[in-house]
Amino acid sequence: MKILLYGGSFDPPHNGHLNNLRAAAERVHPDKIVVMPAGTSPFKQGTNASGALRLEMCRCFAALAQEPGMPPLEVSGWEVAQAAAGSRNYTVLTLEMLARENPGAVLYLAIGSDMLLSFEGWHRWQDILRIARVVVTSRDIGDAPALHAKAKLLDPSGGRILFAPVQALPMASSQLRARLAAGEECEAELPEEVRSVIRREGLYRNTEGSSR
């Protein structure tokens, strides 16, 4: 069984996230996808929406499972629950949990190309590569040589870091938060399920977007 993990702050989740996950799934053809919003990211100062609301907004990913050729998809609140209990979130711990709960499964981790360039800063990054294969969604923006050089440095033997080409969508959560704070709806960038939660809760209004 092949399981593809896709994590992030998802503050808010947007169509670029869906596009990246679709590309990663098409690259490795998993039997199951697990979308995991972070409780508290080690790389960010905080999130604008609570873990519970980001988890609710991530239900928008379920639409991918209805597309031809896509596997079942689970939106997991495990990291959000860990953070609520006072635990620090690290990707390697999530992968270890998935490995325990799915003995014999082949694990994949989908990340963006910017994350690969900073991968050595991840907690126990060597163990991440031991436990899972990393699928990098790579946009055609001229950074391919640097990405492949980085992959060779991190994984000299090859086979643990894969690339999934993806059409670049010009959006980032920080930019969307700023536009939402200015009163825009961002209909082209945000699924209706996400916009519905934002409207209901009044999220991102009169707040500055902090980090992507």
Identify the function of each model-found stretch.
Residues 1-212:
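Nucleotidyltransferase catalytic core that binds NTPs
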